[in-house]
Curated annotation (Swiss-Prot):
Belongs to the PCNA family. One of its GO terms (molecular function) is DNA binding. It holds the Pfam family PCNA_N. The keyword DNA-binding applies. HAMAP family: DNApol_clamp_arch. Transmembrane segments: none annotated. This is DNA polymerase sliding clamp. GO terms for biological process: leading strand elongation; regulation of DNA replication. Homotrimer. The subunits circularize to form a toroid; DNA passes through its center. Replication factor C (RFC) is required to load the toroid on the DNA.
Amino acid sequence: MPFEIVFDGAKEFADLIDTASNLIDEAAFKIAEEGMSMRAMDPSRVVLLDLNLPASIFSKYDIDGEETVGVNMDHFKKVLKRGKGKDILVLRKGEENFLEITLEGTAKRTFRLPLIEVEELELDLPELPFTVRAVILGEVLKEAVKDASLVSDSIKFIAKENEFIMKAEGETQEVEIKLTLEDEGLLDLNVEEETKSAYGVSYLADMAKGIGKADEVVLRFGNEMPLQMDYPIRDEGRLTFLLAPRVEE
């Protein structure tokens, strides 16, 4: 099914694909009348990604029906990263088995990316009984993950009433990042019970790569449960990650 969709801000779209490409090698994007979506799992089956971009966030969204396009994420990322901040991104598909990517700025540059067959798995985003919901600034999360990487390959999230802690412990070193609602970096915190869970630092680093410093990131987790991380894309869109916990001995 032919389609043409236009996104004002090629770099923003490229950052989304760049983040996803750190975790998955290929993806099947569903282009439907209500919007563009993608759900995939990394090869190690540790992280589930769910991308939802409603038609309303595009400046033009023209499709009659539904189309699934499979792409090599590394190739897709490299093309998109050729766009500048103010470039307009146009994605088109005609009758041929190519995705046409046009970057409109000081010149109009068009790339043709061959589509590939991607196995579409039935992946559900489960409703889990999380006991914590924390909203933090993207900058805080990114810096905490960098701090933790100096000490350990895992980071522990600890939530108590009015307090959210990110902590990493190595053989000889440790680091603790403590936030309360009095701190600018913690925007909201709801804790049903004291909760602890640990996660892999390298996965969190990949998940946080595309987050802007001023973005609001929603973290949900429970005791030794997966971490659900959501961040909004132009208010109505959303990128969600579900990261399996590190079970500590």
